[in-house]
Curated annotation (Swiss-Prot):
Residues bearing PTM Arginine amide: R65
Record-given protein name: Insulin-related peptide 4
Tissue specificity statement from the Swiss-Prot or TrEMBL entry: DAGWWLTRGAARSLGGVR-amide: Expressed in corpora cardiaca (CC), corpora allata (CA), antennal lobe (AL) and gnathal ganglion (GNG) (at protein level). Expression in CC and CA detected in most animals, in AL and GNG in few animals (at protein level).
Keywords for this protein: Amidation, Cleavage on pair of basic residues, Neuropeptide, Pyrrolidone carboxylic acid, Secreted, Signal
Segment forming the signal sequence: 1-19
Coiled coil regions, renumbered to chain: none
GO annotation terms (biological process): neuropeptide signaling pathway
Protein's organism: Agrotis ipsilon
Pfam family, one: Insulin
InterPro entries recorded: Insulin-like (IPR016179), Insulin-like_sf (IPR036438), Insulin_CS (IPR022353), Insulin_family (IPR022352)
Family membership: Belongs to the insulin family.
Cellular component aspect of the GO annotation: extracellular region
Subcellular location: Secreted
SMART domains named in the record: IlGF
């Protein structure tokens, strides 16, 4: 019984890790929310937070601002989580 449970857990873990590495297409709001969740955590995207960023949050965007090609990378073709993380 314990051996069956252990094998089942190992198979489930490997299936979940493969699903995360799978390339997917992200566009528009879904792309921006996914990137924000990966870079700054799941609680970083809030609708009621207001339009203005705090001074520290605005400064943290300085390195990301100049990068181009995210929409091409993940909307025109599928991208992986690792590719999304490279834009953080």
């Amino acid at each position: 019984m314990k051996l069956t449970l252990i094998i089942l857990l190992v198979v489930a873990y490997s299936w979940c890790s493969e699903a995360q590495n799978e390339a997917r297409v992200f566009c528009g709001r879904v792309l921006s929310e996914r990137l924000a969740a990966l870079c700054w955590g799941p609680n970083s995207v809030k609708r009621d937070a207001g339009w203005w960023l705090t001074r520290g949050a605005a400064r943290s965007l300085g390195g990301v601002r100049g990068k181009r090609g995210l929409a091409t990378e993940c909307c025109d073709k599928a991208c992986t989580v690792e590719e999304l993380l490279s834009y953080c």
